[in-house]
Amino acid sequence: MAQREKKVEEPTELRAPEMTLCANSCGFPGNPATNNLCQNCFLAASASSSSSSAAASPSTTSLPVFPVVEKPRQAVQSSAAAAVALVVERPTAGPVESSSKASRSSSVNRCHSCRRRVGLTGFRCRCGELYCGAHRYSDRHDCSFDYKSAARDAIARENPVVRAAKIVRF
């Protein structure tokens, strides 16, 4: 008990440094080591000062100029025109009914082997079909996926054959 009274507790309070915003008023926190500029503004200012022969003082730095990258619009327009052409070519009477039946049957998840409804607990096999918990393993259903060749290809892809140059002996 006497030992506890002699021990003086020191405060273990951690203080975070005050956050200062960027000097260019971009909204990001500034760093005192970079004259209160954020990383983006500092990189832009250093790039502009290195490209120009006259170095600007930190108080007279201007806002950084970011290049504007324009996306190619021709690809978007051509794909939109192709989609319109595809829509125009479809007949509207017959396939609409069959597509509604197909979407209705695909929304019901059933086991491929026993046709039991599996819902969200279904397991998708590597052969591409959906199975229940009883048929989820490849030996429980007639799986058409070749696991041996897939593993062989994966091993060959991950471990390429390295051949050294032939040593010429004199």
From Swiss-Prot:
Zn(2+) 3 binds at C125, C127, H141, C143. Coiled coil: none annotated. The gene is SAP11. Zn(2+) 2 binds at C111, C114, C132, H135. It comes from Oryza sativa subsp. japonica. May be involved in environmental stress response. PROSITE patterns: ZF_A20, ZF_AN1. One of its GO terms (molecular function) is zinc ion binding. A zinc finger (AN1-type) spans 105-151. Signal peptide: none annotated. PANTHER family: AN1-TYPE ZINC FINGER PROTEIN, ZINC FINGER A20 AND AN1 DOMAIN-CONTAINING STRESS-ASSOCIATED PROTEIN 11. A zinc finger (A20-type) spans 16-50. SUPFAM superfamilies: AN1-like Zinc finger, Glucocorticoid receptor-like (DNA-binding domain). The keyword DNA damage does not apply. This is Zinc finger A20 and AN1 domain-containing stress-associated protein 11. Zn(2+) 1 binds at C22, C26, C38, C41. Keywords: Metal-binding, Stress response, Zinc, Zinc-finger.
